[in-house]
Swiss-Prot record:
Gene Ontology molecular function, alphabetical: peptidyl-prolyl cis-trans isomerase activity; protein folding chaperone; ribosome binding
EC number: 5.2.1.8
Any single Gene Ontology cellular-component annotation: cytoplasm
Gene transcribed to yield this protein: tig
Family, similarity comment: Belongs to the FKBP-type PPIase family. Tig subfamily.
Matches recorded under HAMAP family: Trigger_factor_Tig
Listed name of the protein: Trigger factor
Length: 442
């Protein structure tokens, strides 16, 4: 149903369509249009030179009569800019961004009557007040107890620090490590070079780290062995830009892990094996606590996503679904090592999962920004700097470049703010849930 909002300078008529598509007519007052007209004339004056006048000093009426096309073009741009901003300041369906404008046109342009500008654009979702009273999280589970078996597994992992790694010529067997490179190429293009998906990646031939199908391909093979596969799935061919996968075994490595004793424990800054076990237990308990907190965080995300429904912008949703679908199909083909036939059977299920994941992710994106704003949450300078350092390490490694451009710095700031906005909003949801759980119902 059409709606109208206005102030002394602008009026905005809005009509909404599914998918957060909005049609708007912005009416610009004569006063605003005349002010913008003066700005346009001033700019044109600075760009031209007229005989008998110093640059920028020609009378307005002379400029308007001699350069009407230039003035009208400049004025049109200024009017469109002001009308666009009015969509947010006067209207209540803010565009996602300038790029979200599908079309715009000036339908009236008169210094006596004002201007009219029509827009079609994608807007931020309209989200109602959150019904916090309906927020519900599962009862929090205690962190996992650390068993003696966990300690032994931890010692085995520590033992890898002292392990002897020997390249062998014999065929690979259970427990070995293998170094693999994976390339993709086009079978029907002799001139095309292969592209690396990964190089010299290490895998352990074990049930814990490989799917059965993947492990089976690389048991009983030697260094230099190649596994060549043809991709028949059109989606995977499109994603990888090729139809042939070549796995090359660079090395088969036998690993011998010694038993950890007091001497080796002292090399790890522990007083004895018992002291190392005690320190390991503390570390594993911290990891278990972190895992518990992450699970609770995920439960809060799930609860928030279910708290309220609203329409999502069509283009953002389609883009996110496409991205997640790609990730899921590639993961199934290259990591879980599904055959093309198995992938075809699972494809509809994976696409459905991608649609659900994309919908949830976008809902949480908009909901967390709403919570951050509504609840007046804040980000300290120290928090922002810490998160910028995290983002920088993820992007550049431990040694970021000395000279970072302003654009790159701005990207790091935005990434850090987005992460902190999201995490602080979810933490607020957790506090709300705890408060509701501790408040007796009437």
């Amino acid at each position: 149903m059409p709606r109208s909002l206005s102030n002394e300078q602008f009026s905005v008529d809005l009509e909404e369509s599914p998918g957060c598509i909005v049609s708007a007519l912005v009416k610009v007052s004569p006063e605003v249009l005349n002010k913008l007209n003066k700005q346009a004339l001033k700019k044109i004056k600075k760009e031209i030179t007229l005989p008998g006048f110093r640059k920028g000093k020609a009378p307005d009426d002379v400029i308007a009569s001699r350069y009407p096309t230039n003035v009208r073009k400049e004025l049109g741009e200024l009017v469109t800019q002001d009308a666009y901003h009015a969509l947010s300041t006067v209207g209540d369906r803010r565009p996602l961004s300038p790029k979200a404008v599908r079309s715009n046109s000036i339908t009236q342009f008169d210094l006596q009557e004002g201007a009219k500008v029509e827009f079609s654009y994608e807007a931020f979702p309209a989200i109602s007040d959150l019904p916090w009273e309906n927020l519900s999280l599962p009862q929090e589970e205690a962190a996992s107890e650390i068993s003696d078996s966990d300690i032994e597994k931890g010692l085995t992992n520590i033992g890898m620090f002292f392990a002897t790694k020997t390249p062998v010529e014999r065929p690979s067997q259970e427990g070995d490590f293998i170094s693999i490179s994976l390339h993709v190429s086009k079978s029907n293009d002799e001139n095309a070079s292969s592209a690396a998906i990964f190089e010299n990646k290490y895998f352990k031939l074990s049930e814990e780290e490989m799917t059965d199908a993947f492990k089976e391909k690389f048991l009983g093979i030697s260094t230099g062995h190649r596994v060549v596969e043809t991709i028949t799935s059109p989606e995977i061919q499109s994603f990888l830009r090729g139809d042939t996968l070549t796995f090359t075994v660079n090395a088969v490595i036998e690993v011998s892990i010694p038993e950890i004793d007091d001497e080796k424990a002292r090399q790890l800054q522990a007083e004895s094996l018992d002291d190392l076990k005690a320190k390991l237990r503390i570390q594993l308990e911290k990891q278990a606590k972190d895992k518990q907190l992450q699970k609770r965080f995920s439960e809060a995300e799930d609860a928030l996503a279910m708290l309220v429904d609203f329409e999502l912008p069509t283009s953002l949703l389609e883009e996110r679904i496409s991205l997640i679908t790609r990730e899921k199909l590639l993961n199934a083909r290259l990591i879980q090592y599904c055959s093309d036939e198995e992938l075809e059977k699972r494809k509809s299920e994976l696409i459905k999962e991608a649609e659900e994941d994309a919908t949830k992710a976008l809902k949480l994106l908009f909901l967390t920004h709403k919570i951050f704003s509504d609840e007046k949450l804040t980000i300290s300078r120290e928090e922002l700097q810490y998160m910028m350092d995290v983002c920088s390490r993820e992007r550049f490694g431990q040694q970021p470049p000395k000279d970072i451009s302003n654009d790159t710095l701005q990207e790091l700031v935005m990434s850090a703010r987005d992460r902190l906005t999201y995490s602080k909003a979810i933490e607020h949801v957790l506090r709300k849930a705890e408060l509701l759980a501790s408040t007796p119902s009437a």
